A protein has these predicted regions:
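Short loop/turn motifs that connect adjacent beta-strands in outer-membrane beta-barrel proteins
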Residues: 71, 121-122, 185-191, 281, ...
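Transmembrane beta-barrel strands of outer-membrane/channel proteins
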Residues: 1-3, 76-80, 127-133, 194-200, ...
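Hydrophobic, lipid-facing positions within transmembrane beta-strands of outer-membrane proteins
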Residues: 58-62, 107-113, 129, 175-181, ...
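Gram-negative outer-membrane beta-barrel transporters
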Residues: 438-582, 586-597
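Residue-level signature of outer-membrane beta-barrel architecture
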Residues: 66-68, 117, 185-187, 198, ...
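Extracytoplasmic gating/loop element in the C-terminal half of outer-membrane beta-barrel translocons
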Residues: 586-690, 697, 722-750
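Solvent-exposed loop/turn elements at secondary-structure boundaries
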Residues: 299-329, 333-494, 672, 690
């Protein structure tokens, strides 16, 4: 049994120093929301909160081993994990009410049986079967619409009142059955393994974002103008609401307001491998694997969409069923030990590896056919009313006309394939100068990966420069091609073979007879990909693929996990107190230095008209170009002051000043290099009782010990923007805004990982 509880401090709340949110203004906004709710007969008691984020879990397992006889051994294991994690706390640029914080809950039950059999002197068999039941859910506070107001203060701060919009109805049930059998044949200097690995999945996915309604105001002025009109009963009050979202299940179709998308699939695999000991020093391993995905269900048919897609030359249908195509994975590897004394070992291999797509991506096509769900997305419409009763969103007047029937469609290529990579590695282990060395190179090339298109939008044939006169920015412009049709967004899941990564590493280790162990390593990595695909939603995965050219054909960019430089080192010293071997003391220091997280800079707003807000990479203008850019004044930030501040900020920010007149490429720069030291000390006391040795070990670990010595050491940095996508410039209504001083900050110490942490341990072995 294992129990774990962790708390992560949340440093930013109402009135916290350094926050970008105007505290007095935020309080007035919340009071106005409560007043409007009360006038509508709904009691709302939300307060701004910044509790520490907690993560806790309970784990239990039981294992039974049975030696049936000399030839058969049976093992049965059951394990249970109950885990919870709090999410949705505020940050330096956001202030949230307590009901915006949600809890992620996960319960997993696993039972597995394994039978090992020796069939003959040259044949053995391993049979495994398991069942895994996973129940995941997200819960938030008392149901209430999501209300977001931007620019609460002069530094682009925002407040979130009410539930987090993705957590209003969110749960996933998974049942996975696995069967595996491996038969091994020992034939001379060959070890041949033949086997099968099969998995059967059943999914039930509840996901209805914006179920209680989501309202977005661009600034406090719009919000308070709406509030005054609300109190006065003024017609047309809805024009101040910049965006309204609502989604609900079509109960006449689904029979259930909290409808779940359900589907099943399987992956069947067969393989054969031969490990050939050519000599005492040379070993060759080669084999072939075949995986066959099977899909048991088909999404619902949306006849109007299918007709439109066929007329426009698209090969998509909502009721496409994925093809079951065999995926072949040949592999070969070798290991050569020069003298069979481990003084020089050369090893390597090359092969194709097949993964599986997170099935939640496929579930989007079952949830979003346009049949089971209705989505409403309305911009600045005078029929929008801020309804604060979460159960009365369907009464909103605009649902009867302006957006009734708007559908978000998710489709996939009929020939869509699971992920496949070609991987190769070459390593050398050798001894020189009394040191153990390891040098290794690893290369990976994408064969099949994912990316998304929104085919409801297409290029107009004009560029941003053509339309605005800002000739230096020639990114294509987009327009909706489904106007007059109910299909507001159509996200297509596709395959791409673009992407690669490689790493080069060197490691040195040395152990001394007097108890000192030293190790150091350096790794250089470069990784490029087409689509981050970090979300469970097709819309987010498309929108989070930042680009400076083509939204539906994104360019290759640095991966979100690209950390070019990594240095590791450790020193451990073990000794016996007063030469008494019953008392062993261990003292150690571990160092890790690495490049900071990669980040991108993009515009807040929709620059190219593709309906993606926050996916347009920023053009880094020269001073001459800034003089030609139109700006919108706000508060104390006049147009001229914004131009001056932007010029000064670009001139002193390291990466930006060197790339004026260029686009900021995806993840092209990294936050500052990070240095972390950990300290470890342990005392082990041993005593022999009869033939049994009993040992008690007491340990102390201080993680990020540098921060204990100096508060400015051991910093870990983030941008405080989602996915490290920084938006210093806003573009809306044909004008830009830079609402900051020349000291606009892009890096902030992360409160938890920048602190030192201590851990005491006690271990008893016998």
């Amino acid at each position: 049994y294992e129990k774990s509880n962790k708390e992560y401090p949340n440093n930013y709340g109402l009135g916290t120093g350094g926050s970008k949110v105007d505290a007095d203004l935020a309080v007035k906004i919340l009071d106005a929301v409560k007043d409007m709710a009360q006038r509508q007969g709904y009691d709302y008691n939300g307060v701004y909160a910044n509790p520490d984020m907690r993560t806790w879990s309970n784990k239990a397992s039981v294992k039974l081993d049975w030696n049936i006889n000399d030839f058969n051994k049976l093992s049965v294991r059951w394990s249970y994990v109950n885990a919870r994690s709090m999410k949705g706390g505020g940050g330096i640029a956001t202030l949230n009410t307590g009901d915006h914080i949600y809890e992620y809950m996960s319960n997993t039950n696993t039972i597995m049986a394994e039978l090992q059999s020796r069939l003959s002197p040259v044949l053995s068999n391993e049979l495994r079967a398991s069942y895994v039941m996973v129940r995941d859910a997200r819960t938030s506070g008392t149901p209430f619409p999501a209300i977001q107001i931007s620019k609460v203060g002069n530094n682009n701060g925002s407040v979130n009142i009410g539930n987090e919009y993705n957590s209003m109805a969110n749960g996933l049930d998974q049942d996975v059955f696995t069967f595996e059998d491996n038969l091994t044949w020992y034939k001379g200097n060959h070890t041949i393994t033949m086997g099968t690995h099969n998995e059967v999945y059943s999914f039930s996915n509840l996901f209805i974002p914006n179920l209680f309604g989501s309202y977005y105001f661009q600034n406090p002025d719009d919000f308070f103008s709406y509030y005054e009109g609300f109190k006065a009963g003024t017609p047309g009050i809805g024009k101040y609401i910049n965006q309204y979202y609502f989604q609900q299940a079509n109960v006449d179709v689904t029979g259930n307001a909290r409808w779940r998308a359900k589907f099943g699939s399987a992956q069947v695999g067969f393989y054969i491998q031969d490990k050939w000991d050519i000599s005492n020093s040379l070993q060759l391993t080669y084999g072939l694997r075949m995986d066959l995905p099977l899909f048991f269900d088909t999404p619902s048919e949306n006849a109007p969409f299918n007709e439109w897609a066929a007329q426009n030359g698209y090969g998509y249908r909502t009721n496409n069923k994925l093809n079951s195509t065999p995926m072949w994975s040949p592999r070969v590897g070798f290991r050569w030990d020069k003298d069979n004394r481990h003084k020089l070992i050369v090893r390597g291999g090359v092969g194709i590896f097949t993964g599986r797509v997170p099935f939640v991506w496929l579930s989007n096509s079952f949830s979003n056919t346009g049949i089971q769900m209705s989505s409403y997305n309305v911009k600045r419409n005078d029929k929008i009313t801020l309804i604060l009763d979460p159960n009365k969103q369907a009464e909103n007047g605009q649902l009867l006309n302006a957006s009734s029937g708007n559908q978000t469609i998710n489709v996939f290529d009929k020939d869509f394939k699971f992920a496949q990579n070609l991987r190769a590695n070459l390593g050398v282990d050798f001894k020189a100068l009394g040191i153990d060395w390891t040098a290794e190179a690893i290369y990976s090339k994408t064969l099949n990966d994912v990316y998304y298109q929104n085919i409801a939008y297409a290029e107009t044939g004009k560029t941003f420069g053509d339309i605005t006169g800002m000739y230096w920015d020639n990114r294509p412009m987009y327009e909706r091609v489904t106007k007059g049709l109910p299909f507001s967004n159509i996200y297509a899941l596709k395959n791409s073979n673009k992407g690669y990564s490689y790493s080069l590493s060197l490691k040195a280790e040395k152990s001394f007879d007097f108890g000192l162990d030293l190790a150091a390593s350096y790794t250089f990595t470069q990784s490029k990909s087409l689509c981050p695909a970090t979300s469970s939603q097709a819309s987010s995965n498309w929108n989070n693929t930042s680009t400076y050219r083509f939204s539906n054909a994104p360019e290759l960019g640095y991966s979100a996990y690209n950390l070019p430089h990594m240095i590791k080192a450790s020193a451990f010293y073990r000794f016996h107190i007063a030469n008494n071997k019953n008392f062993t003391t261990t003292i150690g220091v571990i160092y890790q230095g690495r490049s900071g997280s990669p980040y991108s800079m993009l515009y807040s707003g929709d620059l190219n008209g593709d309906n993606g807000r926050g996916n347009d990479l920023m053009f880094i203008p020269t001073d001459e170009q800034i003089d030609l850019m139109p700006f919108k004044a706000q508060g104390n930030y006049t147009e001229d002051l914004q131009r001056q501040n932007l010029k000064a900020w670009l001139a002193k920010t390291p990466y930006l000043k060197d790339h004026r007149g260029e686009y900021f490429k995806r993840n092209a720069d990294n936050l500052p290099f990070e240095n972390h030291f950990d300290f470890h000390v342990a005392e082990k006391m041993s005593v022999k009782v009869g033939k049994q040795v009993h040992a008690l070990e007491l340990s102390l670990d201080i993680l990020n010990v540098g921060n204990l010595l100096n508060k400015d050491w051991g910093r870990t940095y983030g941008t405080n923007y989602s996915n490290e996508l920084i938006s210093p410039l806003t573009y809306d209504g044909g004008k830009f805004q830079f609402l900051s001083t020349p000291d606009y900050v892009i890096k902030y110490p992360q409160s938890y990982y920048s602190r030192w942490r201590g851990q005491l341990g006690l271990k008893y072995t016998f």
